């Protein structure tokens, strides 16, 4: 039987096992549990499982659960340990697929979609905190990108695997997703760091930490929380309305719409690894600035182009954003916050900020979309504006800090006498 040990022994193999387990967790709980639902929506309505209004109501369950899970993740881990909590959450997400194969009632379905969201939020808070401390410092960005590659694979799978499963039937599609999740849960089961290995890493972190009370979080950390929230606002329109924009907004065929969604999935696969690589080589702050600039331009470009090749290119760039910003934000926290425990707290707060604004944005965009007669351009303009504000805020804080530092270094007239 395969067991996990501290990665300092035959170490490198164990590190990759930990990363593989993290990838499986993000794939099951977010990649599939959230994004595989989108292509199932027409079939849920067409098969008369639920009405169109009920399906929209059920769509919110996962986002609400994600926020609950982000808040509950660390308290659960404090009772069960990180490894046991991650296994439990993967089982919960897997069970939700099988449960949703039987639409007993709206309450039943909503409850299981809510539980799948709770699993996703808890895993997002815990998975990096469980795996990354075992990774060499020079590879943390790339490793976090590999972990959250699962989100991108889930987005891509929503455009490829789900249509195949739907050809077998709606109930079979849910069961098929459950079987895939069960397989991934089994693959990851023994890949998590052992309790002894985690204890050793935590002890080393405590030994290397500065004595005294933890330092309060500085302005740059709170800026990151705000940026991460604005990123959530910026990614929702493409994530929810992209295919509808291409097919109904631009008059393209359903086939073109499906191809565009596949391109979004390609970007989602590339994003975590590329962004993690950038974090390792450019630093997290510079990488975030670069990504925000490129994303703001790409999202704004959706409003301006009617060329399908250019649209496909923009969609690849935009698709890299939802899963790619996770390793970037995580790397920025590691730059700003000392100590493993404080980093976990900061990451949990960042995830809660993201989850809150993602849920609010999803509701807000729906209100705007219904209020303006179903025009998509305004949604993408708001999204581009939110991303631009995140970039401007970062540059603004840097300028303020630079002026403050210059003022402190300038000697007063009395000091020169």
Question: Where do the PLM segments sit?
Answer:
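Cytoplasmic helix-loop-helix junction between adjacent transmembrane helices
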Residues: 112-150
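Helix-loop-helix hairpin linking two adjacent transmembrane segments in secondary transporters
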Residues: 145-193
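Intracellular juxtamembrane helix-capping segments at the cytosolic ends
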Residues: 122-135, 324-338
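A membrane-interface helix-boundary motif in multi-pass transporters
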Residues: 164-179, 367-387
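Extracytoplasmic gate region of multi-pass secondary transporters
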Residues: 38, 220-262, 272
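Paired small-residue
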Residues: 107-115, 309-317
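Helix-breaking motifs and short loop linkers at transmembrane-helix boundaries and internal kinks
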Residues: 49, 81, 102-108, 251, ...
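A late C-terminal transmembrane helix in Major Facilitator Superfamily
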Residues: 340-372
């Amino acid at each position: 039987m395969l067991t996990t040990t501290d990665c300092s022994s035959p170490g490198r193999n164990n590190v990759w096992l930990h990363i593989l387990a993290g990838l499986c967790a993000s794939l099951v709980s977010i990649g599939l549990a959230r994004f595989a639902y989108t292509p199932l929506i027409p079939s849920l309505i067409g098969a008369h499982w639920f009405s169109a209004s009920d399906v929209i109501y059920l769509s919110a369950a996962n986002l609400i659960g994600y926020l609950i899970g982000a808040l509950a993740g660390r308290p659960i881990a404090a009772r069960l340990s990180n490894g046991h909590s991650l296994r439990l959450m993967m089982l919960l997400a897997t069970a939700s697929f099988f449960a949703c194969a039987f639409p007993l009632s709206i309450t039943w379905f909503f409850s299981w979609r809510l539980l799948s969201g709770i699993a996703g939020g808890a895993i997002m808070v815990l998975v990096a905190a469980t795996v990354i401390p075992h990774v060499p410092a020079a590879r943390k960005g790339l490793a976090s990108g590999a972990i959250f590659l699962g989100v991108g694979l889930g987005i891509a799978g929503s455009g490829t695997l789900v249509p195949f499963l739907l050809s077998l039937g709606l109930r079979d599609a849910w069961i098929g997703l459950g079987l895939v999740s069960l397989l991934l849960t089994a693959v990851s089961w023994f890949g998590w760091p052992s309790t002894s290995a985690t204890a050793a890493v935590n002890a080393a972190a405590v030994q290397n930490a500065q004595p005294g009370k933890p330092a309060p979080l500085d302005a740059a950390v709170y800026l990151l929380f705000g940026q991460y929230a604005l990123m959530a606002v910026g990614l929702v329109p493409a994530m929810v309305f992209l295919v509808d924009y291409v097919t109904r907004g631009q008059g393209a065929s359903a086939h073109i719409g499906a191809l565009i969604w596949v391109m979004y999935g390609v970007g989602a696969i590339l994003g975590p690894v590329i962004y993690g690589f950038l974090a390792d080589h450019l630093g997290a702050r510079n990488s975030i600035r670069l990504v925000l600039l490129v994303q703001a331009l790409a999202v704004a470009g959706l409003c301006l182009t009617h060329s399908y090749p250019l649209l496909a290119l923009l969609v690849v760039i935009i698709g890299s954003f939802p899963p790619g910003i996770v390793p970037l934000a995580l790397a920025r926290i590691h730059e700003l916050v000392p100590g493993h425990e404080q980093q976990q707290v900061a990451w949990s707060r960042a995830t809660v900020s993201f989850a809150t604004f993602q849920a609010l944005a999803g509701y807000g965009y729906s209100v705007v979309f219904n209020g303006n007669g179903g025009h998509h351009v305004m949604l993408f303009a708001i999204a581009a504006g939110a991303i631009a504000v995140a970039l401007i805020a970062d540059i603004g804080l840097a300028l303020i800090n630079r002026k403050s530092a210059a003022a402190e270094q300038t000697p007063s007239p009395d000091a020169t006498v």
